[in-house]
From Swiss-Prot:
<feature type="region of interest" description="Glycogen-binding motif">
    <location>
        <begin position="176"/>
        <end position="198"/>
    </location>
</feature>
<feature type="modified residue" description="Phosphoserine">
    <location>
        <position position="66"/>
    </location>
</feature>
<feature type="domain" description="CBM21">
    <location>
        <begin position="154"/>
        <end position="259"/>
    </location>
</feature>
<dbReference type="InterPro" id="IPR005036">
    <property type="entry name" value="CBM21_dom"/>
</dbReference>
<comment type="function">
    <text>Acts as a glycogen-targeting subunit for PP1. PP1 is involved in glycogen metabolism and contributes to the activation of glycogen synthase leading to an increase in glycogen synthesis.</text>
</comment>
<feature type="region of interest" description="Disordered">
    <location>
        <begin position="28"/>
        <end position="87"/>
    </location>
</feature>
<keyword id="KW-0119">Carbohydrate metabolism</keyword>
<keyword id="KW-0597">Phosphoprotein</keyword>
<protein>
    <recommendedName>
        <fullName>Protein phosphatase 1 regulatory subunit 3E</fullName>
    </recommendedName>
</protein>
<feature type="modified residue" description="Phosphoserine">
    <location>
        <position position="33"/>
    </location>
</feature>
<dbReference type="Pfam" id="PF03370">
    <property type="entry name" value="CBM_21"/>
</dbReference>
<keyword id="KW-0321">Glycogen metabolism</keyword>
<dbReference type="GO" id="GO:0005977">
    <property type="term" value="P:glycogen metabolic process"/>
</dbReference>
<feature type="region of interest" description="Substrate-binding motif">
    <location>
        <begin position="248"/>
        <end position="256"/>
    </location>
</feature>
<dbReference type="InterPro" id="IPR050782">
    <property type="entry name" value="PP1_regulatory_subunit_3"/>
</dbReference>
<feature type="modified residue" description="Phosphoserine">
    <location>
        <position position="16"/>
    </location>
</feature>
<feature type="short sequence motif" description="PP1-binding motif">
    <location>
        <begin position="87"/>
        <end position="90"/>
    </location>
</feature>
Length: 279
C-alpha cells in the first residue's frame, strides 16, 4: 500500500513569475514579430510551473524565471522595463516656440534694451586690458643725418672728394645719398656698413642719381641700407673709387651711426578680448 500523497501547499505562481509574464505580454504587444515562447502546463509528476519548452541549446543552462543566475537576467529585465525608457519631448509639445524669428528693416535698426546698454557702459573698461604704450617704431624714432646742411660742407667735399649728403631711417630701411667730386666719367661709390659693431661687415653699392648742385662740380649717388637693429646701432662709411684711387668718408674716423628703436614696431601684449556686438 502506497503512502498517502501529502497535500499540495506550494504557490502555483509567485510574484516574480507573474511579473515576468506581464513583461513578456507587454513586449509581445509592442513587437508582434517577437518569437513566442511556450510554457508547459503543470503535470502529474510535479513539474514546476513556468518551465520553458524551448529546444535545448548546448552549453546553456536552464534557470527559473523567479531566480535569475548571476544577476545578468536581472539587469536584462531592468533594461527592458517600460518604466526606465527614455522619453524625448519637443518644445512645441510643451507649448513653447521652437524658434524665434525677428525681422528688421534696413532703415530701422533694432532697439537695444536699456539694461544691455547700461551693462555695456559699466563693463566697457573691464572687458579690455589697459592699452600698452605705443611702441616706438622706426618711423616715429626717425633719426636723420644731414651733413649737407652743416657749415663747411663744400670745403669738406673738396678735401675728401666724397661726403655724406643725408641719411635717414624709415620703416623700410635706411635711405641716403652722397656727393662725390666729378673726377672722371667712370666712378664707383659704395657703402660699407655693420650692425654688430664691425664684428662683421657688408658693402652695398650706390647708384648714380644725377648731378649735384655746384660749386664744386659733383655728382650725387643714392644708396639704401637695412634698418638699424632693435636696440642697436647701424654703423656705415662711404667709399669712392675713381681713376685707380680710393677715398673715404667715415665721419672723421667716428663712422656714421643710426640708432635703432628700443622696441620692435607693433610690439606689445595682444588684446585678450575683441569687440563683441550685441543686437
Amino acid at each position: 500500500m502506497s503512502p498517502e500523497r501529502p497535500p499540495r501547499t506550494d504557490i502555483p505562481r509567485n510574484l516574480s513569475f507573474i511579473a515576468a509574464l506581464t513583461e513578456r505580454a507587454y513586449y509581445r504587444s509592442q513587437r508582434p514579430s517577437l518569437e513566442e515562447e511556450s510554457e508547459e502546463e503543470p503535470g502529474e509528476g510535479g513539474t514546476r510551473p513556468g518551465a520553458r519548452s524551448r529546444a535545448h541549446v548546448p552549453g546553456r543552462g536552464r534557470r527559473a524565471r523567479s531566480a535569475p543566475a548571476g544577476g545578468g537576467g536581472a539587469r536584462t529585465a531592468r533594461s527592458r522595463s517600460p518604466d526606465t525608457r527614455k522619453r524625448v519631448r519637443f518644445a512645441d509639445a510643451l507649448g513653447l516656440e521652437l524658434a524665434v524669428v525677428r525681422r528688421f528693416r534696413p532703415g530701422e535698426p533694432p532697439r537695444v534694451p536699456r539694461h544691455v546698454q547700461v551693462q555695456l557702459q559699466r563693463d566697457a573698461l573691464r572687458h579690455f586690458a589697459p592699452c600698452p604704450p605705443r611702441a616706438r617704431g622706426l618711423q616715429e624714432a626717425r633719426v636723420a643725418l644731414e651733413p649737407a646742411l652743416e657749415p663747411g660742407f663744400a670745403a669738406r667735399l673738396q678735401a675728401q672728394r666724397i661726403c655724406l649728403e643725408r641719411a635717414d631711417a624709415g620703416p623700410l630701411g635706411v635711405a641716403g645719398s652722397a656727393r662725390v667730386l666729378d673726377l672722371a666719367y667712370e666712378k664707383r661709390v659704395s657703402v660699407r656698413w655693420s650692425a654688430d659693431g664691425w664684428r662683421s661687415l657688408r658693402e652695398s653699392p650706390a647708384s648714380y642719381a644725377g648731378p649735384a648742385p655746384s660749386p664744386p662740380r659733383a655728382d650725387r649717388f643714392a644708396f639704401r641700407l637695412p634698418a638699424p637693429p632693435v636696440g642697436g646701432t647701424l654703423l656705415f662709411a662711404l667709399r669712392y673709387r675713381v681713376t685707380g684711387r680710393e677715398f673715404w668718408d667715415n665721419n672723421g674716423g667716428r663712422d656714421y651711426a643710426l640708432l635703432g628703436p628700443e622696441h620692435p614696431a607693433g610690439a606689445g601684449a595682444a588684446e585678450p578680448q575683441g569687440w563683441i556686438h550685441f543686437i
